[in-house]
C-alpha cells in the first residue's frame, strides 16, 4: 500500500511532468539519455544514494554535488528538474522517477521492454529474432531489449515482457516434462 501511495503521489506526477517538459521542448530523447545516466550514477554508488536520501544534509550541498556530477552531461532543463526534486525533498525518489519516465516514453512510442535471459550471450541474429518474436507477441512498434546471461538455463531463452513470460529454455522444458511425468504417475 505504501509503495502504491508513493508511486501515485510522487513518482508518477514528477515523471509525467518531466515528460511534459520534454515534449514541449522536443527533448524526449535527450531526457532518455539523462535519466539513464542518473539511474546508472545512483545505482553504481551507495554513497550517493545515502547522501541524496539523508535529510540532515542541506539541500544546497545536494545541489552542488548533483551539479558537479552532471556538468556538461545533462540538459539544463533536466538539471533544473533535479534541483526542483532537491527543493521539494523528492530527490531520494530520483531512480524511480527516471525509470517511470522511461516507461512513459516507451508507452508513448509503443515500445515494449523485453527482459531476455539466455544461457549464453545472444548474437545479432538471435537478438533480431527475439525482437521480432516480442513484436509479434505484443504488437509493439519496437522493442527495447535488456539482456542477461544465466548458465543454469542450459540452453534457450526466457523472455519477460510486462507480466508475460515466454520460457523457451531447456531448463524450463525439463521442468515442464518432470511435472507432466509426475502427474502421469
UniProtKB/Swiss-Prot annotation:
Domain of life from the UniProt record: Bacteria
Lipid bilayer topology: Peripheral membrane protein
Family stated for the protein in its record: Belongs to the ATPase delta chain family.
InterPro entries listed in its UniProt record: ATP_synth_OSCP/delta_N_sf, ATPase_OSCP/dsu
The protein's assembly and partners: F-type ATPases have 2 components, F(1) - the catalytic core - and F(0) - the membrane proton channel. F(1) has five subunits: alpha(3), beta(3), gamma(1), delta(1), epsilon(1). CF(0) has four main subunits: a(1), b(1), b'(1) and c(10-14). The alpha and beta chains form an alternating ring which encloses part of the gamma chain. F(1) is attached to F(0) by a central stalk formed by the gamma and epsilon chains, while a peripheral stalk is formed by the delta, b and b' chains.
Entry GO CC: plasma membrane-derived thylakoid membrane; proton-transporting ATP synthase complex
Cited function: F(1)F(0) ATP synthase produces ATP from ADP in the presence of a proton or sodium gradient. F-type ATPases consist of two structural domains, F(1) containing the extramembraneous catalytic core and F(0) containing the membrane proton channel, linked together by a central stalk and a peripheral stalk. During catalysis, ATP synthesis in the catalytic domain of F(1) is coupled via a rotary mechanism of the central stalk subunits to proton translocation. This protein is part of the stalk that links CF(0) to CF(1). It either transmits conformational changes from CF(0) to CF(1) or is implicated in proton conduction.
Keywords: ATP synthesis, CF(1), Hydrogen ion transport, Ion transport, Membrane, Thylakoid, Transport
Name used for this protein in its record: ATP synthase subunit delta
Alphabetized HAMAP family for the sequence: ATP_synth_delta_bact
Location in or out of the cell: Cellular thylakoid membrane
Protein's organism: Thermosynechococcus vestitus (strain NIES-2133 / IAM M-273 / BP-1)
GO MF, one annotated term: proton-transporting ATP synthase activity, rotational mechanism
Amino acid at each position: 500500500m505504501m509503495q502504491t501511495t508513493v508511486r501515485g503521489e510522487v513518482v508518477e506526477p514528477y515523471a509525467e511532468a518531466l515528460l511534459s517538459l520534454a515534449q514541449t521542448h522536443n527533448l524526449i530523447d535527450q531526457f532518455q539519455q539523462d535519466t539513464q545516466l542518473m539511474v546508472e550514477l545512483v545505482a553504481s554508488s551507495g554513497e550517493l544514494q545515502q547522501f541524496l536520501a539523508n535529510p540532515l544534509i542541506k539541500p544546497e550541498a545536494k545541489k552542488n554535488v548533483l551539479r558537479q556530477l552532471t556538468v556538461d552531461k545533462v540538459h539544463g532543463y533536466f538539471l533544473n528538474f533535479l534541483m526542483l526534486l532537491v527543493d521539494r525533498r523528492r530527490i531520494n525518489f530520483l531512480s524511480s522517477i527516471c525509470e517511470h519516465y522511461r516507461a512513459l516514453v516507451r508507452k508513448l512510442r509503443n515500445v515494449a521492454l523485453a527482459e531476455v535471459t539466455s544461457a549464453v550471450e545472444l548474437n545479432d541474429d538471435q537478438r533480431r529474432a527475439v525482437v521480432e518474436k516480442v513484436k509479434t507477441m505484443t504488437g509493439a512498434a519496437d522493442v527495447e531489449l535488456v539482456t542477461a546471461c544465466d548458465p543454469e538455463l542450459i540452453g534457450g531463452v526466457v523472455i519477460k515482457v510486462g507480466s508475460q513470460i515466454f520460457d523457451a529454455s531447456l531448463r524450463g522444458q525439463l521442468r515442464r516434462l518432470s511435472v507432466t511425468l509426475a502427474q502421469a504417475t
